[in-house]
Amino acid sequence: MCNAYRIGRDTRSTPAVLPEGLLRDLSEDRLVRRTDRAPVYAGGSDLVTMRWGFERPGLGTVNNSREDKLDGPMWRKAFQERRCLVPATGYFEFTGPKGLKRTHLFARADGTWMWIAGIWEESSEHGPCFSMITTEPNATVLPYHDRMPVVLEPGEIDDFLAGRMRHFKPPAESLRVADAANPLLKRPRPVQEELF
């Protein structure tokens, strides 16, 4: 789930609990794929660049962590000590059989930033790495996938970063979903309406 997301475009919507101007350098639309380096907020006054995905022996790169597994040995220390926010303007999901998959882009209905709950750790090989936390889907996402990123509301950000938020639920706000070209292909197939 969620192997690619977008950043960029909207710089108006930094929640009041975060430093003013935090998103000023993210006005260019950009795709982030698993193992790419991307900006995250881990406290302080600026975004920092981290690699998307924890490396685990036998598992390779694990880019998402389930909220119901955060007390397990793979995630516990990062969840207790190193939380972060992943800014995104949308994320992608895929449905259908191999070779005929359809791509769907999920974004906030008002077009503003999503603040996705994350955790991070230091890797001797890759430097700082982050993972998104996932939860059960809300009604918008359920027809497409059985998990979704934890999208925090502005009022939840402080509690999450301070470690006071330990349980997650899908956001009540419905997200906008649209068909999209597959961003993981070198030359994405056009979306149907782009053909005419």
Regions found by a protein language model. Give the residues of each.
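Short linear sequence motif anchored by a di-proline
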Residues: M1-F196
